[in-house]
């Protein structure tokens, strides 16, 4: 597929997701990075978003709960270019009923070439980057060219 570019603004749109066993870890990371996160637009799956907002006071746009379709809602926002960064603390040692949704969310993040952090270390590296505070060009699939070729 042909590629095009998309500009991520200096104030990123960041999705926050965590499996049940990882919610405490994500809360700790968010609390430690609250000052940085306040400069961005935050989204989350339902249960995670409500918990983070309640505990930190951050403004977070919450989807519905992940197992009820929240992962899919975030995936749709990614494919529409409305999410720039995905922070997803998932539990690799515990299967969840909505594993196909989890895989789909990670796949769509890769398709649309957005940065993904899956644990505290990768989130720390990602948020330590000066690119988090800058306008950034990323390559994405050129879906419009794809549609034009199909007709």
Swiss-Prot record:
Active site residues per record: 71 (proton donor/acceptor)
Superkingdom assignment: Bacteria
GO biological process annotation, one example: methylglyoxal biosynthetic process
UniProt KW Cell division keyword: no
Reactions this protein catalyses: dihydroxyacetone phosphate = methylglyoxal + phosphate
GO terms for cellular component: cytosol
Lyase found in the keyword field: yes
Coiled coil location: none
Residue span(s) of domain MGS-like: 1-151
GO MF entry, a single one: methylglyoxal synthase activity
Binding-site positions, substrate: 19, 23, 45-48, 65-66, 98
The entry's keywords: Lyase
Enzyme Commission identifier(s): 4.2.3.3
Its biological purpose: Catalyzes the formation of methylglyoxal from dihydroxyacetone phosphate.
Family affiliation: Belongs to the methylglyoxal synthase family.
Protein's recorded name: Methylglyoxal synthase
Species assigned in the record: Vibrio cholerae serotype O1 (strain ATCC 39315 / El Tor Inaba N16961)
Organism placement in taxonomy: Bacteria, Pseudomonadati, Pseudomonadota, Gammaproteobacteria, Vibrionales
Gene: mgsA
């Amino acid at each position: 597929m042909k590629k095009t570019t998309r500009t991520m603004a200096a104030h990123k749109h960041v999705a926050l997701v965590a499996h049940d066993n990882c919610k405490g870890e994500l809360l700790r990371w968010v609390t430690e990075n609250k000052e940085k996160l306040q400069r961005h637009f935050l989204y989350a799956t339902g249960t995670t978003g409500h918990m983070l907002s309640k505990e930190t006071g951050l403004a977070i746009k919450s989807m519905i709960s992940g197992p009820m379709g929240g992962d899919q809602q975030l995936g749709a926002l990614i494919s529409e270019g409305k999410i720039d960064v995905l922070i997803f603390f998932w539990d690799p040692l515990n299967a969840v009923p909505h594993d196909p949704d989890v895989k789909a969310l990670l796949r769509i993040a890769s398709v649309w070439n957005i940065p993904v952090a899956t644990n505290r270390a990768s989130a720390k590296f990602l948020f330590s980057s000066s690119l988090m505070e800058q306008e950034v060009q990323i390559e994405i699939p050129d879906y419009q060219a794809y549609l034009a070729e199909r007709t």
